[in-house]
Amino acid sequence: MTIESVPRSGFGYFIFGIKIALSPSIRKFVLLPLIANVLLVGGALFYIFSNLNTWIEGWIGALPSFLSWLSYILWPLLVLTVLATFSYFFSTLANFIAAPFNGLLAEKVEELLSGKKVNDDGLLDVLKDTPRILAREWRKLVYILPKAIGLFLLLLIPALGQTVAPFLWFIFTAWMLAIQYADYPFDNHKIKFDDMRNNLKQKQGKSYSFGALVSVFTTIPVLNLIVMPVAVCGATAMWVAEFKDQALRSRL
């Protein structure tokens, strides 16, 4: 049984992504996505922790008096929600900037796992393809933003925003992160965005669990600085094992 055909859970693919990112033939392709993530997410964390206490106290203060007893339960939930929201926003921005290099990383990981050449593009070819890659990133944002705005508005509703919204936001973030990172290997094969989403929906358990673990890691200081390249590697491993054969056949 080849390494890419070994069944894994969504969690397992993310953990496997760590091993792939550290492999000698992949490390050099990890560097540029890593730098982009460190700069943007690191700056975001500094801003978040400078203001977190003020934000949380404001939200807790908006609770009706008869729900004030929930404040001790809601504190950790709201902290996680704020961390996940801002980390997701800034990691999305980092992904947008690093998209060409994430695509190249996904290509090299697929070649490592499958032993087959994906294409003959070098760095110059990747740079030439940047407009198309950024258009794909924009397509993702068009899909994500209306839903994110709706959930953000839900956060502002007293009581409902402090109780239900954090759980909905976590589920939403898990799905969006699965789409964000799985899209790189799909896009390397020019598979349409809607077709990519439909493929992920066919294996929602693995897609959601992969995205959920990525979401958790994006909220952990220091570890969240390495999430981007690891998630690209893990999502590409999931593509090779779970989606590649069917997706390429259906494209014919």
From Swiss-Prot:
It is a multi-pass membrane protein. It comes from the Bacteria. GO terms for cellular component: plasma membrane. InterPro entries: CysZ_sulfate_transptr, Sulfate_CysZ. The gene is cysZ. Keywords: Amino-acid biosynthesis, Cell inner membrane, Cell membrane, Cysteine biosynthesis, Membrane, Sulfate transport, Transmembrane, Transmembrane helix, Transport. Belongs to the CysZ family. One of its GO terms (molecular function) is high-affinity sulfate:proton symporter activity. Its main location: membrane. The keyword Amino-acid biosynthesis applies. It is found in: Cell inner membrane. This is Sulfate transporter CysZ. The chain crosses the membrane at residues 29-49, 66-86, 141-160, 164-186, 212-232. Pfam families: EI24. PANTHER family: SULFATE TRANSPORTER CYSZ. GO terms for biological process: cysteine biosynthetic process; sulfate assimilation. High affinity, high specificity proton-dependent sulfate transporter, which mediates sulfate uptake. Provides the sulfur source for the cysteine synthesis pathway.
